[in-house]
Amino acid sequence: MNQMNPAFVMPDVQSTVDTRQIPIQRVGVKAVRHPLTVRTPDGSAQPTVGTWNLDVHLPAEVKGTHMSRFVALLEENKAPLDSSAFRALLTSMLEKLEAPAGRIEVSFPYFVNKTAPVSGVQSLLDYEVSLMGDSRDGATRLFLKVLVPVTSLCPCSKKISQYGAHNQRSHVTINAELIDDVPVEDLIRIAEEEASCELWGLLKRPDEKFVTERAYENPKFVEDLVRDVAQRLNDDHRIVAYVLEAENFESIHNHSAYAVIESDKRLR
C-alpha cells in the first residue's frame, strides 16, 4: 500500500513553461451536468439541472489550465442564477483560473406554469434555455437563447381547401445578445404570441376547440412567423443583436420548412 511522504511535494505539471509558444483560444471542461436554480420573474427560484461548458484563454507560455477549478467554481456558486449572477460567475472564473478571457455556457430545461385558454386548468410546459457569457479585452457579452414550441397552420392549405388546413408543431429559437436584463418568459411570450397558436401541457375538450380554431384563424407561413417575431425583437431596446430561427415540422412532407433572420442593431 502506497503511503504519502509528508516531506514530498507534488509537482504542478500544468503550471510549467510550454516551449512551443502556441496560445490556446479556448480550453476547459465540456458537458458538465450540475444542479442549479434559476431566478424567476416573481423572485422565486426554480430548481433544474444545467449542462455546463466552461473555458478560458491559455497563454502561449503556460502548459495547462487548472481543470479542477472549473468544477470547483460550480460547487462554490449555488446562488439562484439570473443575468447579474451569471456575469459575476464569469468574473469569478477568470479570477480563479487567472485567465485574461473566458466563456461560460449553460443549458437547462425551464418550466412555465400555463393556464388553459377555456377550462383554466393549469399545467407545466418545458422550454430549452441557454445562457452564454463571453469576457475578453475587458468587455463582457451576454446571450440568452430559448427554444419555444408552437403551432403553425399553412395559409395556402387553408385557402385552397374546402375544409381544414394542414398544421404542425414548430420550433422558434431566439438567440439574443442582451444589453439589459430580459426574463426568459419575455422571449417565450414573443414567440408564442406571433405563432398561429401556442402550446399547453394539458388541455380539455373546450380548450382543444379553442386551439384548433385559433390556429385556423391565424395562419402563417414559416416566413410570416420569423418576420413577425423579428419585428418584436427589433422593437425591444434590451436586445442589441439576435439570431432567430423558425422550423415547421411539416405534417404533409417528410421534411421541415425553415427560415432564419440575423440582425445586429449596432450595424444599422
Swiss-Prot record:
Belongs to the GTP cyclohydrolase IV family. It comes from the Bacteria. GO terms for biological process: tetrahydrofolate biosynthetic process. The record marks 154 as: May be catalytically important. Pathway: Cofactor biosynthesis; 7,8-dihydroneopterin triphosphate biosynthesis; 7,8-dihydroneopterin triphosphate from GTP: step 1/1. Its EC number is 3.5.4.16. InterPro entries: GTP_cyclohydrolase_FolE2, GTP_cyclohydrolase_FolE2/MptA. Keywords: Hydrolase. One of its GO terms (molecular function) is GTP cyclohydrolase I activity. PANTHER family: GTP CYCLOHYDROLASE MPTA. This is GTP cyclohydrolase FolE2. It comes from Paraburkholderia phymatum (strain DSM 17167 / CIP 108236 / LMG 21445 / STM815). Converts GTP to 7,8-dihydroneopterin triphosphate. It catalyses: GTP + H2O = 7,8-dihydroneopterin 3'-triphosphate + formate + H(+).
